[in-house]
Every structure is written in C-alpha cells, then in structure tokens.
C-alpha cells in the first residue's frame, strides 16, 4: 500500500505544481487528432500510478537480490522522469524537450519492465498499460510540438 501511495503522491504533486499551466493544453494549443478530453488524463493517471505502485510493492516484497535492487532503482528513476515531464511540458511549455525527456522515460520504462520480469512476472505485466499510455503520450507530445511551433 505504501508503494501505491508513493506513486499516487508523486503524480498528485506533479499535478499540483502544473495546475496553473494545464489550462494552456485545454484551451490555447492546437491538439493532434485522437486527443482525449481533459477529464480522461487524471482518471488514466490515477489507475496507472496505482498499477506502478502495486508492481513496485511486489518487487519490494520479493527476496533480496541484485535484480530486485536494480528494479527498485529503475522504478525510482522512471518516477522521477515521469514527474519532471509534466513540469517540462506544462509549466515550461518546452514541447521539444518534453518529447526528448519522454523518449528517455519510455526507455527507462521498457528497461524497468524487463528488470521487473526477472523478479516478478505479474509486476512486469502490470506496467504494460503505463508503457502503452507513455507511447500515446509521446504521440500527443509530438503533435502538440509540431502543431504549435
């Protein structure tokens, strides 16, 4: 439960920090086709942060091993990258940099999933929706960047 709370808290903090900047995405920017309504994002992210936390908890509860430690470090790294992406995209509106940052996050996610798989298969499977959403987010980020230059 602690891992779920940690994940949700990071997401909530990022949301709180950029709350005054999110309006630009909703109103002032040209968004790419398939952009979901704004209400979808907090719902999806709440579920994804819960899945992240459940996966991390399963890893944490696994027997100590170098793979477990690596998995937890990767979890922390991707959570950090996830947090800062919101700040880069919404607060600074640095859409190109945000896309590069998101590509790095995507790589970390893929690496984390592979690391999780070596420790707990279910923990790894719980991260696939996150990777898929990050892929969709990259499409949206790219679209916003290209359409609003």
PLM regions: where:
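Membrane-interface loop-to-helix entry segments
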Residues: 36-51, 92-105
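Helix-adjacent hinge/juxtasegments
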Residues: 50-86
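Membrane-interface helix caps and helix-loop-helix hairpins in membrane proteins
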Residues: 85-97, 145-149
């Amino acid at each position: 439960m602690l891992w779920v709370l940690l994940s949700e808290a990071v997401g909530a903090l990022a949301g709180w920090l950029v709350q005054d900047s999110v309006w630009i995405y909703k109103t002032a920017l040209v968004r790419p086709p398939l952009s979901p309504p704004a209400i979808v994002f907090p719902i999806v992210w709440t579920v994804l942060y819960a899945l992240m936390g459940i996966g991390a908890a399963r890893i944490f509860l696994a027997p100590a091993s170098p793979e477990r430690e690596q998995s937890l470090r990767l979890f922390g790294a991707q959570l950090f990258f996830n947090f800062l992406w919101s700040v880069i995209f919404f607060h600074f509106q640095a859409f190109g940099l945000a896309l590069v940052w998101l590509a790095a996050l995507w790589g970390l996610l893929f690496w984390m999933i592979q690391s999780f798989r070596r420790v707990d298969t279910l923990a790894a499977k719980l991260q696939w929706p996150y990777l898929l959403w990050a892929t969709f987010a990259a499409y949206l980020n790219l679209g916003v960047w290209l359409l609003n230059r």
